[in-house]
A protein has these predicted regions:
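Active-site neighborhood of glycoside hydrolase catalytic domains
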Residues: 203-210, 214-221, 241-350
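Short acidic, Pro/Gly- and aromatic-enriched capping/linker segments at domain boundaries
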Residues: 82-102, 337
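Aromatic- and glycine-enriched glycan-recognition loops and surfaces
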Residues: 156-242, 274-278, 319-332
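Glycine-rich, aromatic-flanked loop segments that form ligand/cofactor-binding clefts
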Residues: 48-77, 115-140, 148-151, 177-184, ...
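Glycine- and acidic
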Residues: 147-156, 162, 197-201, 261-265, ...
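Polysaccharide-binding surfaces and accessory modules of carbohydrate-active proteins
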Residues: 1-79, 95-97
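Short Pro-Gly-centered flexible turn/kink motifs
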Residues: 99-118
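Non-catalytic terminal segments and appended small domains
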Residues: 2-8, 12-15, 25, 189, ...
């Protein structure tokens, strides 16, 4: 709560490939808000807002930043009442969310971080950077420089062979690139966007010696090797879907919406997370992989889990995010020196 309303509201909005443009408007009586109901923080709005005095610039003046440490549906809002006082709210979006607590159970909310400065927006930004670099980021890569990488996707899309990939890597090595990343198309029967997601084993028609063989050849060039995954997604034309059609998030007896011809696996279910972990762990154990590009190319729709009763369907969105966090935690614990980079069709998820 703030005792007055003499602030400008700054939000960071946009769309795919043009995320986080600053937009500013003056507070007045009523509510200003941003949020997401897409199952992720979205390309449209970031879970971060600033209240600043009208005369604040980059290097002087008061500002308060609010950042939600969460990857799912969120709401951030500021309300000015009839007395011109301001109340800021930030957390899990209340729409389509509820959580049933049994006796003796507890619920942990996401953390909202608030930073104040009287030295301008640049100081506010630097304070958040230092805080997250030292208190949120962790592990082997926290204080290390990231390698310079090249990714084959824009050069080849799905049309590649092992020799074509090695040619790209050799040329990149000559320019000082340190890491070669193989993007979409290396797994299952993945020759286009319609098939293969969920089958995280090498397509030996393209890669005769699999990922293990390719990673050794990239290492022989003198480069590190990285790999693209989209662990949360599945195509209906895949071994995984044929074996477990009930593993997707979908409302019973309703049309199943797809995005990029793919469906969202129900990560609120432990057996689904366990299965994906097992496939990824096997591959990462066998091959020399230094980097993972973790993608998420569609939003969640028809949010329903087959394993939860009707009175707990409001938990699915949040349980899904907890499942994603669990998979990250298990993989990072098992492979602490792999660099994980989060991609959600670009900048679609915090």
């Amino acid at each position: 709560d703030l005792p007055d309303c003499c602030y400008d509201w700054m939000q960071f909005s946009g769309a795919w490939a043009r995320e986080r443009y600053p937009k500013t408007r003056q507070l007045e009586q009523g509510i200003l808000s941003v949020g997401s109901m897409r199952g992720n923080s979205s390309h449209n709005h970031n879970p971060f807002v600033i209240l600043k005095r009208p005369d604040t610039d980059e290097f002087q003046g008061e500002a308060i930043g609010f950042s939600l440490i969460y990857s799912g549906n969120f709401l951030a809002q500021a309300e000015v009442d009839t007395y011109d006082t301001t109340r800021v709210l930030m957390g899990i979006h209340p729409s389509c969310f509820d959580w049933k607590l049994e006796a003796g159970e507890s619920f942990q909310t996401p953390e909202a971080v608030m930073v104040y400065t009287d030295q301008g927006l640049n100081h506010l930004s630097q304070t958040f950077h230092r805080l997250y670099q030292k208190r949120l980021a962790r592990g082997y890569w926290r204080d290390r420089e990231r390698p310079i990488l090249i990714n084959n996707w824009e050069a080849t899309c799905f049309d590649f062979t092992e020799e074509k990939l090695l040619e790209i890597a050799r040329t990149a090595k000559e320019t000082g690139v340190e890491l070669f990343v193989l993007d979409d198309g290396w797994f299952g029967e993945r020759s286009n966007e319609h098939a293969g997601l969920g089958d995280w084993f090498a397509n030996t028609k393209r890669l005769p010696q699999g990922i293990t063989g390719l990673s050794k050849k990239i290492g022989g060039i003198g480069m590190k090797f990285g790999l693209w995954f989209e662990p949360e997604m599945v195509n209906k034309d895949s071994d995984l879907y044929r074996q477990h059609p009930d593993w997707i998030i979908a409302a019973p007896e309703r049309r199943q919406s797809h995005g990029r011809f793919q469906y969202v696996l129900d990560f609120s279910r432990k057996e689904v997370v366990d299965y994906i972990y097992s496939m990824m762990e096997t591959l990462l154990s066998d091959a020399d992989i230094s980097y993972i590009k973790w993608d998420m190319n569609r939003s969640i729709t028809e949010c329903f889990s087959n394993t939860l009763p009707a009175d707990r369907q409001g938990e699915v969105y949040h349980r899904y995010i907890l499942g994603v966090y669990e998979l990250y935690e298990r993989l990072i614990g098992r492979f602490p020196q792999i660099l994980f980079e989060s991609c959600a069709s670009g900048g679609g998820r915090f």
